[in-house]
Amino acid sequence: MIQARNKLSKEELSEAKKLIDCCQAYDGTYRAPYLSNMLNFDPNMPAFFLYYEKGELVGLLTVYADDQDVEVTILVHPNHRRQGIARALFTSFEKETASFPIRSVTFQTERIFLERHPDFVSNWGLVEDENTEIWLGKDRRPYPLAKLSNLEVLLAD
């Protein structure tokens, strides 16, 4: 069963984060989808499509739409893949957002996912965008507080 929402409840947000963590651990991915509609051009447009099976969230489509060129991310629990859940989510997205002025849809994913699922692009009839984002990271290094004279640490309430 698919439910479309323009905003996630606390429980749905918790379920979504759990599903994202599971998919990331399985796929070796790191980028988390945006789980708010705060920046979407129309706050009434559905931005979250949740696929439940026997009361468990097994699929999620998120929409980031700060303008009419929207980005979607689709996540399906590893144990429920290749069962049409992603397509059902995308079909629901197309139907539910048909009345909104969407100009284009871009699928967001990571290189490692495409390498592990080489048929994904062709199966969906997609064209890879060469203008992809590059995410850089750096390991954190501890900063001894005693040596930072311009820093005051307070406990939050």
Where are the regions a protein language model picked out?
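Short amphipathic alpha-helix that is part of the acyltransferase structural core
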Residues: 1-35, 136, 142-157
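Conserved catalytic-core motifs of GNAT/GCN5-like acyltransferases
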Residues: 108-110, 125-141
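Conserved GNAT acetyl-CoA-binding A-motif
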Residues: 69, 95-112, 120
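A short, internal acetyl-CoA/4′-phosphopantetheine-binding micro-motif in the GNAT/acyltransferase core
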Residues: 73-83
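Conserved acetyl-CoA-binding loop-helix of GNAT-fold acetyltransferases
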Residues: 82-95
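Conserved active-site tyrosine of GNAT-family acetyltransferases
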Residues: 117-122, 126
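Conserved beta-hairpin
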Residues: 46-59, 154
